[in-house]
Amino acid sequence: MQDPNADTEWNDILRKKGILPPKESLKELEEEEEGKEEQRLQQSVVKTYEDMTLEELQENEDEFSEEDERAIEMYRQQRLAEWKATQLRNKFGEVLEISGKDYVQEVTKAGEGLWVVLHLYKQGIPLCSLINHHLSGLARKFPDVKFIKAISTTCIPNYPDRNLPTVFVYREGDIKAQFIGPLVFGGMNLTIDELEWKLSESGAIKTELEENPKKAIKDVLLSSVRDPVPMRRDSDSEDD
């Protein structure tokens, strides 16, 4: 097929008759090609700086044009905001000890969207010590959740020891779940996975456990009851 932009006598006649559109000027073609090339370069730059860390952006900033600098600065601010949000979410990682006077600041005013797990305990109660140990592991595993503990009577005067251990789960100052007394926790057989599952049911943490670990233990026990180990028959010991 003949190129309608070709500079031929026949094409000139067709243009005069209005059969062919006016020929694109060389300048227009060059501008169009330059625009496409600039777009390709910009896309290349975007792909480059989107893969960079904040430190790498700073090291390579002299290599970008003025237009790129504006785009990169916007991207830098976005990355910085994301980094700050991550640091805010991951600012805990341990169980904090508080007293009653700290309650309002550490629980009620803990922060928007923040989950708080409070363990009321007393020294000398073995199950309280076990739960404190488990909570330390969970605090490291879920650093975006605020885990705190307090001696019970410093927060609630005359709080009965029979209610210990007690765990309250809060979100934005409101109680979302409460676990009161040793029976709720299953006694000293409580595992860290079982405690993680309990807290996940309240919404405080996002567990990767697929089912209640206590259920698995029950299934094993029930299976052993249904299918007892057969008694050994020592038939060879009795000879006529």
Swiss-Prot record:
UniProt modified residues of type Phosphoserine: S44, S65, S235, S237
Region Disordered: start-end pairs: 21-42
Full protein name: Phosducin-like protein 3
Domain Phosducin per the UniProt entry, residue ranges: 27-181
GO molecular function, one term: vascular endothelial growth factor receptor 2 binding
Stated family: Belongs to the phosducin family.
N-acetylmethionine found at: M1
Location of this chain's protein in the cell: Cytoplasm; Cytoplasm, Perinuclear region; Endoplasmic reticulum
Induction description: By heat shock.
Domain of life according to the entry: Eukaryota
Subunit comment: Interacts (via thioredoxin fold region) with KDR/VEGFR2 (via juxtamembrane domain). Forms ternary complexes with the chaperonin CCT complex and actin substrate, leading to inhibition of actin folding. Interacts with XIAP (via BIR 3 and RING domain). Interacts with HSP90AA1 and HSP90AB1.
InterPro entries xref list: Phosducin-like_chap/apop_reg (IPR051498), Phosducin_thioredoxin-like_dom (IPR024253), Thioredoxin-like_sf (IPR036249)
Post-translational modification: N-terminal methionine acetylation destabilizes the protein.
Function: Acts as a chaperone for the angiogenic VEGF receptor KDR/VEGFR2, increasing its abundance by inhibiting its ubiquitination and degradation. Inhibits the folding activity of the chaperonin-containing T-complex (CCT) which leads to inhibition of cytoskeletal actin folding. Acts as a chaperone during heat shock alongside HSP90 and HSP40/70 chaperone complexes. Modulates the activation of caspases during apoptosis.
Record region (Thioredoxin fold): 92-240
Gene3D superfamilies the UniProt entry points to: Glutaredoxin (3.40.30.10)
Keyword Nucleotidyltransferase annotated: no
Record keywords: Acetylation, Angiogenesis, Apoptosis, Chaperone, Cytoplasm, Endoplasmic reticulum, Host-virus interaction, Phosphoprotein
Any single Gene Ontology cellular-component annotation: endoplasmic reticulum
GO BP terms: actin cytoskeleton organization; angiogenesis; apoptotic process; cellular response to heat; chaperone-mediated protein folding; negative regulation of chaperone-mediated protein folding; negative regulation of ubiquitin-dependent protein catabolic process; positive regulation of angiogenesis
